[in-house]
Amino acid sequence: MQEAIKPPVEVQYKEELEVLKNTDTGRCPQNWQMSPKAVRTFILGSSQPISYQGKEYQIQKKYFGNDALIERCIVTLAGNRGLMLVGEPGTAKTMLSELLSAAISGVSTNTIQGTAGTTEDMIKYSWNYALLLAKGPSREAMVPSPLYVGMEKGILTRFEEITRTPAEIQDSLI
């Protein structure tokens, strides 16, 4: 099996996520796997170790910046609203979106990569034309996009480089 250059956040921090999920006593918003407080702890770390199954676990700090920004992101997502991270290159937008997705949905890889060539089909769904011809329009012939998968499963969809997409794509999402 090939090893990934950079494993997904949910693989890289699997143990921390498991500890937080299983020790979390807070209320989880719908489709969240842990409470907003546990999501904050996952990203900003814990000052005290967490006891789980007879062991002590220290949740490491993953984001070094403005803690209030993390809290605003979590509150926005808990309010069932979209979140757009905007900033200069290298300001940890992708890293933060991966951490939030892994903590909230358990998956950080449900992603659309925006380019100048991104079309509406790429953000909704497309068709497996061989199956479409053989069986007609059916769920089996449909190839869902990450956005479709996110809506179907109730998980976050990350949209990288949305500003590179054509204006009509941006307008349809915003």
Model regions: which residues?
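AAA+ P-loop NTPase catalytic core and its hallmark functional loops
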Residues: 2-174
